[in-house]
Amino acid sequence: MTPSLAPRRVILPVIYGIALLIAWEALAHSGAVSRLVLAGPLEIVVAGVRNWSELGFNAGVTLAQALIGAAIGNVAGLLVAICFVHWGFFRRAVFPLAILCEAIPVVAILPVLILWLGNGMAPKIFVAAFLSFFPMLVNAYRGLSNVDEEVRELLYSYSATASQMLWKVRMPAAVPFMFTALKLSACSSMIASLVAEWLASERGLGFLVVYYGQSYRVADIWSAAILSCLISLGLYGITAACERRALSRSSP
Amino acid sequence: MRGPALSLAFEGRRPWHWMGLDIVMLNAFPDEATRVRAATLPAGLYADGIDVVFRRGSHSVQALKDCSLDIPRGSWATLIGASGCGKSTLLRVFADIVKPTAGTALLHGVSPAEARANRIYALVQQGSTMLPWRSIIDNVALGLEISGLPKSTRYARAEEALALVGLKGFEKSLPSELSGGMRQRAAIARALTLRPRFLLMDEPFGALDEITRDRLHFELLRILEETGATLLLVTHSISEAVILSDKVIVMTPRPGRISEIIEVDFGRGRTPDLRGDPRFVQYEAQLRRALHQPA
Ligand SMILES: Nc1ncnc2c1ncn2[C@@H]1O[C@H](COP(=O)(O)OP(=O)(O)OP(=O)(O)O)[C@@H](O)[C@H]1O
Ligand SMILES: [Mg+2]
C-alpha cells in the first residue's frame, strides 16, 4: 500500500458508509417502511447499549462454540489432508466420500444432531467444525501436494524422510493455502454456531435472535445480528493479519 | 556385480567410514582372487547397457539406448549433445531418480539407490530450484539439515560454499531477490556443502555470464582436485566441455545413445591459459565434428 493511496482507500468507504447510515436513518423515520421490518441505526445502537451485558454473555457463548468448532474442524481437516498426501489409496477411497459428505446440508439435519448430541454446545460445535473441515481439507491438500517436481527430486536425492519432506517442504508450501481456509472458517464458524442455536438452545446470539423475534423486538434483533457480524469481521481481520505476518517473509 | 565383497566393504553405512575404503577392502579379503576382484571393481561412475524407456499409456519414448561408460574415480566427464538426447536422463539414472529399464549403473561399485541412501553424490539440477520461503543460506544448508548436522556446522559450511561461488553477503536474501545466475551459483554451493564423492551437475553454468562462468570453471576444478571427487556434468558448451573434462561423452538423439567418447588430455592443474593451448582448438574442432556427425 503506497502512502498516497492509503487515505483514499480508507476515506471513500467511510464516506459511503456514513451516507448509507444517514439514508437508512431517514428511511426508518420517514414511515415508508414499517417499524417491524426495519429499525433505524440509532435505535439499534441504543438497543445494543441497553442489552450490553445480555449480548456480551451470549456472544461469548456463540464465539466460544465457533472457536472450538473451527479449531477442531481445521485441525481435523489438516490431519486428514496430511494422510491424503502420504497414503494415496486412503485418499482415493476417502476423498469422494468426503466430497459427498460436504454436500450434506448440515443445517437441515440439525434436528438429528440435537437428538444425538443434546441441546448444549456440542451440536453447535459440531456444525462449526463440519463447515470448517472441508475448506481446510481441500485447501491444505492442494497446498501440501503443490510441491515442485525438482524440489521433490532434490529432497529425494538427499534421501529425506517423509516427515522431513512434510515439515521442511510441504507444510511451508501449504501455509498460504491454509490461510485461505482459515479465513473462510473465520466467517463460517460464527454463522454456523449462531444458526445451530436457532433450533434448540438456552444461550447464545442465535437463541437471543429467536427470543427477541418472538416478542417483535426488531431493534434488539438487529443489534444481535450486527454484533455477530462484527465478531466475524474481527476473526477475519485477526486471521488476515496473521497471514500477512506469516507470508511477509517469503513474498517481499 | 554386487557380491559379498561389497556388502563387507559397505558395512559402515556412513560416508566418513569409507574414507580408507580401498585399503580396508583389500585387507578384508584373505584370499588373493577376491582381493584382485575387489580391486578391479569400478570405483568411479560405471554404466553398462543402460536403456531407459518412458511409458505414458500406450505411448512410449526410448530416452536412452544401450549407454555404457566408465569414468574412473576422481576423473571428470561431461555429457554433450543436442537438446532431448537424454543427457539429463543419464545423469538422473546415476542419481537414482530415473530407474533404467535395463542395464547396470554403479557409483563406487554400488547401485544408485545405495549411493543415494549413503549420500555419496550431490546433484545440481537443471532448474536450480530453491525453496522460496527460505533465505539463501537456509537453502544452501538444506542438504546438511536433512543429514541432521548441527546448525553451527551447517552454517559454517554453507557460508564457506557461498563465499566460494561469490555470493558472500547474500546469505539472508530470498531466492526471489537473486538473479537467475546467482540462483544457479547458490545451487552449486548447495551441492558443494555436501562434500560429495560424486558431483552430478545438469547444466550448472547455463545462466552465467562469460566472466563468472570462467572463474567458476577453475574454482570447480580446484575443488574437484582437492577433494578427489568424480564429476559428471551436462553442458551445451563445447569449450566448457573441453575445459572441464578428461572425457567428453557425445550423445545423439532418437534414441539417446553415446556416439563417441573423446579423451581430453590436459591432466591436472588446469588454468585459464588452457584456452591459448593449440590442443584446445583441436579438441574443440574434434568435438564440433563429433556433434555434427549424422547419427
Ligand atoms: N519423465 C519423463 N517422462 C517422459 N519422457 C521423458 C521424461 N524425461 C525425459 N523424457 C524424454 O526423454 C528424452 C530425453 O530427455 P532429457 O531431459 O534427458 O534430454 P536432455 O538431453 O537433457 O535435453 P536438454 O538439453 O534439453 O536438457 C526426451 O525426448 C524427453 O521427452
Ligand atoms: Mg536436460
Task: Identify the meaning behind each predicted range.
Chain B
Residues S58, S111-Q125, I146, K151-Y155, ...:
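ABC ATPase NBD coupling module
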Residues R134-L142:
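Short coil-to-helix segment of the ABC ATPase nucleotide-binding domain corresponding to the Q-loop/switch region
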Residues G103-A113:
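Conserved ABC transporter NBD signature motif
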Residues R37-A47, V53-D66:
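A short, flexible loop at the N-terminus of ABC-type nucleotide-binding domains that lies
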Residues A95:
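Helix-to-loop junction immediately C-terminal to a conserved catalytic motif
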Residues E145, S152-F170, R222:
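Conserved ABC ATPase "signature" region
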Residues I80-A82:
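The feature captures the beta-strand-to-loop junction immediately N-terminal to the Walker
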Residues S173-S176, L194:
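Conserved signature/switch motifs of ABC ATPase nucleotide-binding domains
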